[in-house]
Swiss-Prot record:
It holds the Pfam family 7tm_1. The chain crosses the membrane at residues 33-56, 70-90, 108-129, 150-170, 197-218, 252-272, 291-310. Disulfide bonds join C106-C181. The keyword Transmembrane applies. Residues 1-32, 91-107, 171-196, 273-290 are extracellular. This is a receptor for the tachykinin neuropeptide substance K (neurokinin A). It is associated with G proteins that activate a phosphatidylinositol-calcium second messenger system. It comes from the Eukaryota. It comes from Cavia porcellus (Guinea pig). This is Substance-K receptor. PROSITE patterns: G_PROTEIN_RECEP_F1_1 (PS00237), G_PROTEIN_RECEP_F1_2 (PS50262). Residues 365-402 are annotated as: Disordered.
Amino acid sequence: MGACVIVTNTNISSGLESNTTGITAFSMPTWQLALWATAYLALVLVAVTGNATVTWIILAHQRMRTVTNYFIVNLALADLCMAAFNAAFNFVYASHNIWYFGRAFCYFQNLFPITAMFVSIYSMTAIAIDRYMAIVHPFQPRLSAPSTKAVIGGIWLVALALAFPQCFYSTITEDEGATKCVVAWPEDSRDKSLLLYHLVVIVLIYLLPLTVMFVAYSIIGLTLWRRAVPRHQAHGANLRHLQAKKKFVKTMVLVVVTFAICWLPYHLYFILGSFQEDIYCHKFIQQVYLALFWLAMSSTMYNPIIYCCLNRRFRSGFRLAFRCCPWVTPTEEDKLELTHTPSFSLRVNRCHTKEILFMAGDTVPSEATNGQAGGPQDRESVELSSLPGCRAGPSILAKASS
């Protein structure tokens, strides 16, 4: 392996995977360290502030509390935790190659941030499945609030189980007077255990979820873009509802693609290191790792920006959240976006059935009346005149109850 590496299972604090080949304690110029510190500090501030604001927007406003939005809250909390605990502490460890934070936090660092990473990707998968059921199978029963909370709890339990092996084998070692937080895999099968764990993790928290989301959003896209709105409703609620669903799909696809791009180089880095350990002898590898780790962690700060750019309600929520800033001036319309319950249209037919063209309380980040659609009550509206023996009657406008 060469004298350039530490022959221990040094975890240079990936927060997800361990570099068990070890890394030399390369020093860097002060100016370079300052640049990296600024980049990581900006990442943490944007990610924590943005995801905390997203959580507040949804939980503080009754209109926003929908099934899909609960998964968005779960995603935001996971990203917030990953940025706060993973990015900040691991940057210090990776840049100094010394563990300053004690044994207990070593165990914590190899459990909770990794769990948050798993929760993040599984929350995106849950959103994709929820939208698939709402749009492709609109008449199937939707998740209730208790069921949604149970699914979220299950996501955290599965994530904890997947993160536990790295926590279980974590320990503190001393190397030439420097304290290390390492993952000490069983010595008799160290290389095999490491590679197997890397591959299992990549499959379970990257390839498999991305495949599920790709299939789900592909079917959703085909369903929505093939759906035609009847000519007499071309300017009505049905059209707005359909456009809102399309916008939601575009938003979530952008979220997923951003996540995939940010994490792919990081996973490839560790796979390559499992086969070619000598790459860790190169002087530039510390800079490569810091760059790839920053790119991976930056995935935690993009979602709030995407929501704010593509969704009217989130823009209103951000204006309200930052109204103390002199350059932010929320309007009365911003308050109504988050508190006012819109009207919806009912179409009554001879069969005494109702067609709900637009329902209040639809989810974000899809948009309908003023840009929103797709919540727990979100069902595909049905053209009643197409049902046997039924003919649509006059449209009746009714106010939705809050």
